[in-house]
């Protein structure tokens, strides 16, 4: 669902920001 996509994007952003 859309929320799953949002969580996936958030995870990628989290990894990239570290």
Curated annotation (Swiss-Prot):
InterPro entries: Aurein_antimicrobial_peptide (IPR013157). Pfam families: Antimicrobial20. It is found in: Secreted. The keyword Secreted applies. One of its GO terms (cellular component) is extracellular region. One of its GO terms (biological process) is defense response. Its main location: secreted. Expressed by the dorsal and submental skin glands. This is Citropin-1.1.4. It comes from Ranoidea citropa (Australian Blue Mountains tree frog). The lineage of its organism: Eukaryota, Metazoa, Chordata, Craniata, Vertebrata.
